[in-house]
Amino acid sequence: MISISEIHLKNFKSFKNTKLKIPDGFTAILGPNGSGKSNTIDGICFVLGKTSAKSLRAGKFNQLITYHNGKRADYAEVTLFFDNINREIPIDSDKVGICRKVKLNGDNNYYVVWYEVEKQNTKINTESSQKKTSKASKVEKRRRMKKNEVLDLLSKISLIADGPNIILQGDLLRIIDTSPNERRKILDEVSGVAEFDEKSEKAKKELSQAREYIEKIDIRINEVRANLEKLKKEKEDAEKYTVYNKKLKVTKYILTSKKVEFLKMVLDETKDEIEALKETKNCYIQDISNIDSEIIGLKVKINELVNELNEKGSEEVMELHKSIKELEVNLNNDKNALENAIDDLKHTLKMEESKNNDLNETKEKINNIRIDTLKKEAEAKVLIKEIEKLNEERQNLEKKVEQSESQVKALKNQESKLSERINDTQKELYGLKNELNQLENTLNNRTFDYQKNNETIENLTNQIAEFSDLEDTKKLYKELEDIAVELEFSKKKLQEKITERNDSQSKLDNLHSEYVKENARIKTLKDMENFSLDRAVKGVLDAKLPGVVDIAGNLAKTKGEYKTAIEVAGGARLNHIVVKKMDDGSRAINYLKQKRLGRATFLPMDRIKGMDAKDISDTGIIGKAIDLVEFDIKYTNVFKFIFGNTHIVDNLENAKKLSLKYKARFVTLEGEVIEPSGAMVGGNIRRNSAIKVDIDMKKLTNLSEDIKELEQILSNVKDEIERLNNKINTCSTRKLELDNRLKIARDQEFKKEEITKSNNLKIKELNMLNSKIDDEISELTDEKEILSQKVQNLDNKLSEVMGQRERIVNEIKSYENSELSKRIKEIDHKIRENESSKNTLENEIKKGAILVKEVLIPKISELNSNIKSLADKKNMFKNSVEIYKSNIESNSSILSDKRGKYEELTKGLKDLTDKKECYELEIENLQNNKEELREKATDIDNQVNVINVDRAKYETRLEEEERKLYLCDTLENIEDISDEMIEETYSLEIDDLERNQALLESSIKKLEPVNMRAIEDYDFINERYEELFGKRKEYEQEEGKYLQLISEVQKRKKETFMKTYDRVAENYEQIYGEIGGNGKLSLENEEDPFSGGLLIDASPMNKQLQNLDVMSGGEKSLTALAFLFAIQRLNPSPFYVLDEVDAALDTKNASLIGDMISNASKESQFIVISHREQMISKSNVMYGVCMENGLSKIVSVKL
């Protein structure tokens, strides 16, 4: 077992430079009070790692450094040397030291110290020679170490500064007086259950981590579940949308196919119907012909009857009968003619109006052309005059030219003929070129249309391509998961921090309350003793220093009934001096120092801040203190600082009730105060007194430090809350952004589907159009090639003729005078130009004249003729209407008269007349049948016309339906459609198909907009959901594993602890028996010892078993020492340090304890500080400590 061999104290407390050898066994240190004997124990604790200067009986670590002769040393250093023969410390040295050094600036350093043997060569001079000898010496080595490394090293050799083997002054009674739980923890340390605690803590951390993972997984699962539920409906809609679209495509294709078939069938039927109607019409015409034959036969018979009547009756009857029939026929014809005349009149009026409109438009065109022609004729006349002048000049020039008449004439004749040929050819070429230009224009237009369609197709294709790089929603959903976890955990941490803030705020409020109370107590004492304060204030105000305003109380006023309450609420702060700036306050403070006027408090307006009072409306509340005071608004912060969250109430009873409800300061009208903490201030208001009292500022200082510390903690917590709030806001914003991006992605997907569908349809239509244009271009190109070839041939012919003419002209030029020829040439050129311009104008005039003469004037004539004809017709029809109306009236009257007369004359010729009438009736019936047949024939013509109109409509519809069929997706191109669906759709009629199409289109419209990514996203999210559930099960298994591990560790911890407890309890009973009494240890909770404490019962000699609480100080010390020795016997420490543990023992018990230490020192080192002879006499070595010149000195005595 390792032991301390030596202690070196250098500049440590009262020791300047002291080395203290510590042998095995029992070492006693004694000396008078204040000699510094306990400083040796402090040195040991210092090296063993005490972290608090106060535990070493110093304010700060640098106060451990020796202070002597008015000067403090540069550092303090203590080294504990250990016997390392067994190499328990892993350094190859028999003696190893642990050193701790503290400097004036408070820096602490640790070192490991050992000694190495080095040989040194020395020379010895003699008279005859020099000899070399070697001498071994020990050299100190040290290596700096970290504190944790030192503590780990000490722990390995069972040396701990806070262990039960080091008992300082007062520790013995603290062991007894401490709580049972703290006492049990001593056994925890002895039994080594900390190892299990570490394992348990590690397992708990792992368990916590597993649970945190589960919590995170649950958040992810909830987020994924929410997305899954949202996507489920969208997926179903997308699937429906896909199915509906497929059905719609099939329905459209089959419906359009059936419509095409139906229209073709209808056209065939109409063709057959027209043929049948024409055959029927032919039958009617044949029937009419037959009726005409019958009518002729009947008329012959009637003539015979008439002849017979003539023979038998008077001619007058016959004439009268004939006249009646003619009148009846004429009357019927006039009625029919009247109806027709009225219809014709209406039609004529419409035609007349239309022709008049055309006539006005045509006249306007003629007028415009005539105006234009007059302008051009004027221009042409000017050109003609100029040409005449030029021709006259040319003739004069030609007369002057002498030339060979015969040759020049012949050449000119040839040139003239060639010119005519050239003119004819040019005209023909001009016409062909015009035709070619028109053809090229048409070709260019169609080519332009073709290219424009291609550009449109390219644009439409590009529009589709723009949607190829849509945002990956899988990444967005994954990021939403991460954000959800971060957001939920941030909210959880925020709640924890808010709870911590509230707790800290509550503690702070309590501390503030205590501080205010203590400060008020101190202020009262100061007010009682320090009457110079008013003098200081008065001195500053009288000095009228720059920036000094006044005391706060003078800057406000209140009503008389509130005076006491406001004075108490403001307290001494009302006497604080208000200054404009901090510099003004500094100036006033310096003034007080210079004049020695005392002290005063200053409130700088540029820095002072206060607390806003909360709004409280309840029984007894008069108002906020600050609201019951009148002051200039610029002093608002000053009075916020003075009054804070203070409210004035009517009486103490209401104040008490209000303080239970609200966290505020309440002051009654009589001056009682209830602080937010619940503290109450009241009673009789006392005046200043001259009695002086000592003022202990320690509590106030401690409260102030605690407040600062808690305020810092609260500030940190608030910062963390703010950070978490910012993080939550950031996460929430990010989540909204991701949700928005998801929505945009869904909308873009739907837009892509819509645009793709629409654009593909347009592209297909444009391709169909381009196919037709391509055919047109091909035809136009062929025509262009033919025309181009004709133009080329004419160009070649023209070039040849012009070449011949040029040769002749050159030959003529050779006979001509050069100067005259040049002028003639210029004249000819000018004439040609003018002729050309004149011809152009004449052509345009001719065109206009032709247009007027051949088109517009004939059209006007035609229109006038038509209008005149229509006017004549109109008049004729009007006259006809009047005539027919007059005839009908006249003939109706005549017919009535003749019928009366006829009836009188025909009484005797009834049979013949009846027979004749019968024939006439039969003729009339035949005529009616004939008319009916004519009408039927006319109806057939009308029906044929109607059918032809309908046929034209059907042909247009067929063309449209064929176009639609071309644009439809064929059944082969529609994916995933069943034969059953096709057969079922084919089985429906057109009406059913149209209804189905309307229903499908309506269903699709209701579903829109559709998230077409939902199917893919749903599958992805569903897989993620399953994956997360799998992970959760894994973490649940981990959780179970750690729970089981914690349970096993706790079980082993309890078993280990109980073994230690049983042995310590046994040792305790044995040791207490050795000192003449009975003792017993027991656990508060034997089932779960760690949830309870350790109880110690003892019965000193000749006393009953009793509780610690009723024992004397000596009995408690004896019991504590028995407890410590019981532990020592169980697990002896390498050494023990006891500082005046026998102080409360009587002589007998001190001797007994001395014997126990002496016996125990056979196994462990004991260093004991004591004044008792009974203790010291049992030691092996004794050190005496005394104080000389402010430094401790040590004298050793071996006993």
Swiss-Prot record:
Any single Gene Ontology cellular-component annotation: cytoplasm
UniProt KW keywords: ATP-binding, Coiled coil, Cytoplasm, DNA-binding, Nucleotide-binding
Coiled coil, from the record: 192-528, 691-1051
InterPro entries given in the database record: P-loop_NTPase (IPR027417), RecF/RecN/SMC_N (IPR003395), SMC (IPR024704), SMC_hinge (IPR010935), SMC_hinge_sf (IPR036277), SMC_prok (IPR011890)
Pfam families: SMC_hinge (PF06470), SMC_N (PF02463)
SUPFAM superfamilies: P-loop containing nucleoside triphosphate hydrolases (SSF52540), Smc hinge domain (SSF75553)
Major localization listed first in the record, in broad terms: cytoplasm
One BP term from GO: chromosome condensation
Subunit: Homodimer.
Summary of the function given for this chain in its UniProt record: Required for chromosome condensation and partitioning.
PANTHER family: STRUCTURAL MAINTENANCE OF CHROMOSOMES PROTEIN 3
Protein's UniProt name: Chromosome partition protein Smc
Name of the gene: smc
